[in-house]
């Protein structure tokens, strides 16, 4: 795939009128291909491998919150970056997920061509699937380069999406506890 991407990036540069043999551009197609592979390596991962058995028995049913997980992704409409923070809460039912796995789940889905709305849902569904939690909440904040660099060019715009599952959706008190804990 890397050779194909390199060739396509070279063609794109040529179509734009650039000289691909110019000093600063000689290795650009190769670097761009490598960057694109890294930015989309989520396609090569699956939930079971990412979790890697890191589900642990725990005598707790109280809310667990992981906040300010940084992420970056590429929007599926313009292939431009969007970046932000993800906040996750879940209500364990005798099992907890290893802490680093939350960030790994976020990265796995973020490193695919995405929209933030879909990314938020994928993360919530994945956490629900692997933990069997009584409730899951995911809130994502993002700044989208497709809004900032092109089109309407609104530099201070941001987007917030949320998905609430189970008790997080059904109980106002539980949802409000999550929002309070993350300062929203």
From Swiss-Prot:
A biological-process GO annotation: one-carbon metabolic process
Pathway entry: Cofactor biosynthesis; 7,8-dihydroneopterin triphosphate biosynthesis; 7,8-dihydroneopterin triphosphate from GTP: step 1/1
Keywords for the protein's UniProt record, in alphabetical order: GTP-binding, Hydrolase, Metal-binding, Nucleotide-binding, One-carbon metabolism, Zinc
Catalytic activity field: GTP + H2O = 7,8-dihydroneopterin 3'-triphosphate + formate + H(+)
EC number per UniProt: 3.5.4.16
Record carries keyword Repeat: no
Single annotated GO MF: zinc ion binding
GO CC aspect terms: cytoplasm
Entry keyword annotation includes Zinc: yes
InterPro entries (alphabetical): GTP-CH-I_C/QueF (IPR043133), GTP-CH-I_N (IPR043134), GTP_CycHdrlase_I (IPR001474), GTP_CycHdrlase_I_CS (IPR018234), GTP_CycHdrlase_I_dom (IPR020602)
Domain of life, source organism: Bacteria
Binding residues for Zn(2+): 75, 78, 146
Pfam families: GTP_cyclohydroI (PF01227)
Subunit structure and binding partners: Toroid-shaped homodecamer, composed of two pentamers of five dimers.
Family: Belongs to the GTP cyclohydrolase I family.
Name of this protein: GTP cyclohydrolase 1
Source organism of the structure: Pseudoalteromonas atlantica (strain T6c / ATCC BAA-1087)
């Amino acid at each position: 795939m890397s050779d194909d991407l390199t060739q396509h990036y070279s063609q794109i540069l040529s179509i734009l009128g650039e000289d691909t043999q110019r000093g600063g551009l000689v290795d650009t197609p190769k670097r761009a291909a490598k960057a694109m592979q890294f930015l989309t390596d989520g396609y090569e991962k699956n939930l079971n491998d990412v979790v890697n058995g890191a589900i642990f028995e725990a005598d707790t049913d109280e809310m667990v919150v992981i906040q300010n997980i940084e992420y970056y992704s590429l929007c599926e409409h313009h292939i431009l970056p969007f970046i932000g923070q993800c906040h996750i809460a879940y209500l364990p039912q005798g099992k907890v997920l290893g802490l680093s796995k939350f960030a790994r789940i976020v990265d796995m889905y973020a490193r695919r061509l995405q929209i933030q709305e879909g990314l938020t849902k994928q993360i919530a569904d994945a956490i629900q699937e692997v933990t069997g939690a009584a409730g899951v909440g995911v809130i994502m904040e993002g700044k989208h380069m497709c809004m900032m660099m092109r089109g309407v060019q609104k530099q201070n715009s941001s987007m917030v999406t949320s998905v609430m599952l189970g008790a997080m959706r059904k109980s106002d008190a539980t949802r409000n506890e999550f929002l309070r804990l993350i300062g929203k």
